[in-house]
Amino acid sequence: MKVNTLPLVYSCSGCSSAAQLANALALRLTREGLAEMSCVAGVGGGVPALLGRARQPRPKITLDGCALGCARACLEREHIDVTVSVDLSRHGVRKRRDGSLIDPDEAERVWDAVIIPALAAANAGVSA
């Protein structure tokens, strides 16, 4: 799939372990050529080039570490439709603010059980 047709993925990258897991999963989607990560801070900050990219007719996936949904909120604030929104806390990911590293077993479980199905839904144009 060409880069300009891949889903765009926006992730939380806050200070908790759950946020860092969301960011790591978005990076993995990009590294594996399954999606193109874009800058949620740029969308939230109203940066014209990043708003232009976010408004492209491509599926959008948001990956948030917790129920605050900051990545999703940044896009919605700009009236950008999110195709699939993932809240990792709804899938058993606990938010730790103690500087804990990402648990590789948890990352793999979430990848298989949550991220791959979310990607399939986004590619099918199914809102989830």
What are these regions (language model features)?
Residues 1-128:
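Iron-sulfur-associated redox domains of electron-transfer enzymes in respiratory
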